[in-house]
């Protein structure tokens, strides 16, 4: 019987090709709009490290006071050098790392080749285990290397391919800014999006890849300039990179791993105690105004997920509902026009359930055809999101099995 219902439905649809095409197009465009928008929203709103994000915290210390706060009373988003170094020395977290963005030049061994400008971060040794960074070869450096300001480096697999042909380069040397550095680890295609470990400088998303990671104190001692954001509430008294370190300018991102709520509470008390000490010493002339947010809350406070993607998703879902309602209305109008046909079939003995089944089959064919068209248009939509969204966000949208299943 089902094959018979399909045959009747196809005949009915062929009798009104224009109306049939309109209904299929309506569903197809509604599905494509909602799924394309959802693919973007899913990419930008995903948890980059779901198994650990609740244990990663970003501390904020108010070193500027009331005059440097925004309307919401928030302290600076980053840290100055003085506070970051003190938190590192006190080491009240399970794991912790200060970090700032660098852009060193790599001098190839082949003198005929031009230097390579790279991007990366200066971090502490605990950065790698804290963020569960995957390695293709080797590992991060040891804590002793931080203390000794050792000339060691962790590089990306992309840079490893360019410099060493993709071979295991651990133990080999490379020239960075005119100095030899020993490779201790090669990352395994690690480029989390959103780039949660330095939201302040990346805005959460970046098309670029961090190719080098150097010891924080080593980079400072070598005078590697900050390639990220620097915000000041007063002009530094000294010029240059050394003057930046002695100023109240904020340019260092900081992250700490805390196992549970009790550890987070203890760490928050430590931050407040530290601010009290600075107040008593005369450095701060205001009461503590610190923050300690876990990673999801931190990304929310930084508005990592663009608000327009949320609005676009709601609008697209609303459009899908409108399309489905319109299609249902068109089908209902079409079925009501066939009331005489239904009466004749009922007079000949057709059961009410049989007529319902035929109409449902016809509606199902429209839905399947619209869904298939929507699938095709979704693929085209994902390819074209770069025309309306920033490149660093558009490149994250993709068609995969989950999206196909939802479509």
Model-assigned labels for residue ranges:
Residues 37-163, 167, 176-182, 192-195, ...:
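Structured, solvent-exposed hinge/loop segments at the ends of secondary-structure elements
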Residues 30, 343-351, 370-378:
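A short glycine-centered flexible hinge/capping loop motif at secondary-structure junctions
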Residues 126-140, 151-303:
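Mid-to-C-terminal secondary-structure elements
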Residues 317-327, 365-368, 375:
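Hydrophobic transmembrane alpha-helices
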Residues 6-18, 325-366:
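Intracellular coupling helices
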Residues 363-407:
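Small-residue-rich transmembrane alpha-helices
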Residues 15-49:
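Short, strongly hydrophobic transmembrane alpha-helices
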Residues 302-318:
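N-terminal membrane-entry
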